[in-house]
Each structure stands twice: as structure tokens, then as C-alpha cells.
Amino acid sequence: MTNIRKTHPLLKIINSSFVDLPAPSSLSSWWNFGSLLGVCLAVQILTGLFLAMHYTSDTATAFNSVTHICRDVNYGWLLRYLHANGASMFFICLYLHVGRGLYYGSYTYSETWNVGILLLFTVMATAFMGYVLPWGQMSFWGATVITNLLSAIPYIGTELVQWIWGGFSVDKATLTRFFAFHFLFPFLVAALVMVHLLFLHETGSNNPTGIPSDPDMIPFHPYYTIKDILGFLIMLTVLSALVLFSPDLLGDPDNYTPANPLNTPPHIKPEWYFLFAYAILRSIPNKLGGVLALVLSILVLAIVPALHLSKQRSMMFRPLSQCLFWFLVAILFTLTWIGGQPVEYPYIIIGQMASALYFLTLLVFMPLTSLVENYLLKW
């Protein structure tokens, strides 16, 4: 008799995606982050759902409702900090996942890569709107500063900002719509994840060597399911340690002060995972130029496949490109640090240099290095 998982209309989809899926035998732990992102998304949706049951999206009560969740709701403090720090884990896994794609040339699967970029934008938008909901000082002023950037768009900018705000400033209407979208977007992310996986399973996974692995495939279960479960345990251990020992480590103390439109905090900055983009935004003295640089800091990933000039797919056997890749990582750490510093000398010039090097590395140095490596290998 044929196994039900191979014949049932619904189960056979799951079977072909997670059980009998042929996978390269050489996948390293860097291939764990896709499944870890799935776990992060599930944790965020579940904790978010329970938080939404107690949260009120009104400027008069939003801050107090978050306090009420932490003090009066059974394990409300755990839900709130799992959700806040779960977002940090989400972005750590996201950036490592993108980094893996860049290093091993996974971007040559252009459909999967482009859906991934769309996912990155959607997750960033979701996280930004979520940061506004506790209605602390940094929530209010972060929302004001970031939404106000849209006013740099010629001709329609001012009207667009007022349309998003639902008035002439960030207020009750803004908070209500941000809550609505923050609740909706994770389900949009889940739908895009399905599309992402659909495109990935059309081509099959890449592997560390970048060489086609069709003759050497193994079933996803049990080999990679066990490997993924180990990844889940490690990530959930780190998340639990963060939540239970220092839940406010990655947060901003200003967000424990209720939002006050009459009092601007000395340093307005987003959550740590947006600091690199914020540093790129601030490094350009022109408002419209800054907004374009901010968008391009992520959108630049879309033209990486077109700039792949190497005859080899992966960087595994390309030491010069490896050096450049880790140089890029160092630049991103520098930008993250600069994004959290005040706008004064020497931070301004460091930020401008790091921003220029970020774009130059991706758009100029990496393609040129690929050509040099091709020449050295006489290809």
C-alpha cells in the first residue's frame, strides 16, 4: 500500500517540501538560518497574537496597556520580552541568511533572491511599525522622523506624509493604523515565505561549493530535520537567556518614558537592527539624497546577481573575494556603531566613508575582484 504522505493531496505537498525533498549532502550550518527564520516568524505571530489581546491602540492608553501587560497579565512580561527580543533574533538570522546567500552565490537563483529582498523590506516595515506601538518617547519620535522622510519625495511628499499620519502630526490615527498594519504584515510575510520556498524548490538548494550536486542528493528527513532541530534548540536557548537575564539589553531606555510631543529626546535612533541603514541615511546632507541612499542600501542587493562576473558561483575557492566579503561585514558593523552615535565630528566623516565604501564594495570592488580571479585562474 502506498504511504498516505505520498498520496494525500495536502500531505504530499508537505512531504515533497520537508520530508522527501532531495537536498545536497554538503550543506553546512549556514543553511540552518532559513528554518530558524521560520521559527522566529512563528514565535512572533504567536506572542504578538496574545499581546494584541491586551493591547489598546489609543494614544491615551497604549503606554499604560503595555505596562498592564507586564505587571498584571499572567506571564505578560514573558510575552512582551519574547516578542521584543524575538524581533532581534529575527534580524540576526535574517542578516546571517542574506550574508550566506552573498558568500555562496545563492543570489544566482534570481527569483528566490528577489522574493527574499521583498521579504526583507516587509519584515523591516513590520518591525518599524511594531516599535511605534508601545508609545514611548523613542516610539513617537522615531515614527515622526522616519515617516517625515517621505516629505522629501518631490511634489507629493507633504500630502503623502499627512495621508500616512492621518492628520498634521503623528497621533491617534497614526497609532491605530500602524497597529492594524503591524498585525496584518506578518501574515503577508508568511505568504511571501511560501512563494520564496516555491521558487527555491523549483531549482533545489545551492551548496557551499557552488557546484551542481544533482548526483549526490540525500532526503531532507531525517538528515536535515535533525540538524534544524539542533539549530532551533541553540537559538531558543540564546533567546531565552536574553529574555530571562537581560530583556532590556537591546532596547532604548527612552522608550520607558511616555511619548511627549513637546519634549524631543537628545538622540533619536531606531532599534539596533536598523542602525546601519540609519547611518547611511544620515551620511548624506541632502534630505532626498539620504532617503534614496536608505532605500538603495537594501535595494542594492537586487543588482548583485547582475554584477556576478566570476566563473565560479561560490566564494569558497576565491580568497580575494572572501577578503572583500569580510571587509563588507566590517563596514556594516562600523555603520551600525555610527548609527547609534551623535551627529558630530569624527562620527560624521566615519559614517560618510563607511557608507561610500559599502556601496563601492558591492558595486565596484567585488565585480572587479571577480575579473582578477578569473584572469589569475586563466579562465
Swiss-Prot record:
Swiss-Prot/TrEMBL GO biological process terms: mitochondrial electron transport, ubiquinol to cytochrome c
Transmembrane segments: 33-53, 77-98, 113-133, 178-198, 226-246, 288-308, 320-340, 347-367
Positions of a ubiquinone binding: H201
Chain sites annotated for binding heme b b562: H83, H182
UniProt GO MF annotations: metal ion binding; ubiquinol-cytochrome-c reductase activity
Sites where the protein binds heme b b566: H97, H196
Co-factor binding details: Binds 2 heme b groups non-covalently.
Alphabetical list of Pfam families matching this protein: Cytochrom_B_C, Cytochrome_B
Names of the cofactor(s): heme b
Main location as per UniProt: mitochondrion
Cellular component terms (Gene Ontology): mitochondrial inner membrane; respiratory chain complex III
Protein origin, superkingdom: Eukaryota
Subcellular localization, as worded in the UniProt entry: Mitochondrion inner membrane
Oligomeric form and interacting partners: The cytochrome bc1 complex contains 11 subunits: 3 respiratory subunits (MT-CYB, CYC1 and UQCRFS1), 2 core proteins (UQCRC1 and UQCRC2) and 6 low-molecular weight proteins (UQCRH/QCR6, UQCRB/QCR7, UQCRQ/QCR8, UQCR10/QCR9, UQCR11/QCR10 and a cleavage product of UQCRFS1). This cytochrome bc1 complex then forms a dimer.
PANTHER family according to UniProt: CYTOCHROME B (PTHR19271:SF16)
Function in brief: Component of the ubiquinol-cytochrome c reductase complex (complex III or cytochrome b-c1 complex) that is part of the mitochondrial respiratory chain. The b-c1 complex mediates electron transfer from ubiquinol to cytochrome c. Contributes to the generation of a proton gradient across the mitochondrial membrane that is then used for ATP synthesis.
Name under which the protein is recorded: Cytochrome b
Species: Trinycteris nicefori (Niceforo's big-eared bat)
